[in-house]
Structure formats: C-alpha cells, structure tokens
Amino acid sequence: PRRSMSEQAPRPERLVALFVTVFWAAVVFAVDGLLAVILDRDPIQSDVGPYYSVFAFVIAGLVLWMLLSGTSTSRHPVWGAVGAVALVYLSFLLIAALWDLPLVVEQALSPFVLTAAVLAGAAVVATWAGIRSLRWRRSRG
C-alpha cells in the first residue's frame, strides 16, 4: 500500500543538504572574494553579464544539493566527495558552454571555479560526518 506524504518517514538529510548547500554558496562567495583581492583579478574576466554567474551557481548548487541528499547516509564519503568536485566543476563548464567557448576555457582554468568545486567536496565530507555523528549519538541514547 502506498503511503501519503504526511505518513512518509521524514528525510532530514534533504533539509540538512539544503542548509549545507546554502552555506557552501556563502563560503564560496566569501573565499572567491578574498581570492579576487589576493590575485587582483575578477572571477570572470569575460564580459558575459550577470546572468552566467547566477545561473552557474544555481545549477552547481542543485547538483551539490542532490549529491548531499544522496550521499549523506552512505558508508563513506569518498565517492560522494569526488563526485561533488567533478560535477560542480563540470556544471560551471557546461553552463559556460551555453555562452561561448572562450568562457569555457577561462572557467576551466579559473582558480575560482576550482575553489568552488573543492569546497563542494569538503561540504560532502562535512555533511556525511555530521549526520553520521548525530545518528551515532542518537543510537547510544
């Protein structure tokens, strides 16, 4: 028998994943801002307007949220973290491909995109560790 939405078991991992994704975006913006000052360059050198970066971050965030939701209860975070790094990096490149090829090359070599991807992998590991620790404490109490 099929259960209704109100009868289904709650999935706190999805909500935790959403909060972690929002936190990831905030940290990426902060770190990229510091990197821009340190490197004395803009995160996006090309004149693409404001929509590329917003669209790329939304898509990368959705990718990260889905990965976090799916990997937060896995046995270990390694493949989830590797997947997050790769898929967030690729999402920036694929969205850049909608604009033009020079932007793809620029983003592929960008320390800002690499930072976002590495921080996505770190977010997967941190979420996995946090949920695992919470479940371990609940099972003991």
Regions found by a protein language model. Give the residues of each.
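Cytoplasmic membrane-interface segments at the C-terminal ends of transmembrane helices
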Residues: 3-17, 41-42, 61-84, 104, ...
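Generic hydrophobic-segment detector
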Residues: 15, 23, 116-120
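Alpha-helical transmembrane segments
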Residues: 16-32
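Transmembrane alpha-helical segments of multi-pass membrane proteins
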Residues: 19-23, 78-94
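Membrane interfacial helix motifs at helix-loop boundaries and amphipathic/re-entrant anchors
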Residues: 28-57, 92-119
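Transmembrane alpha-helical segments of multi-pass membrane transport proteins and ion-pumping complexes
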Residues: 29-33, 60-65, 89, 93, ...
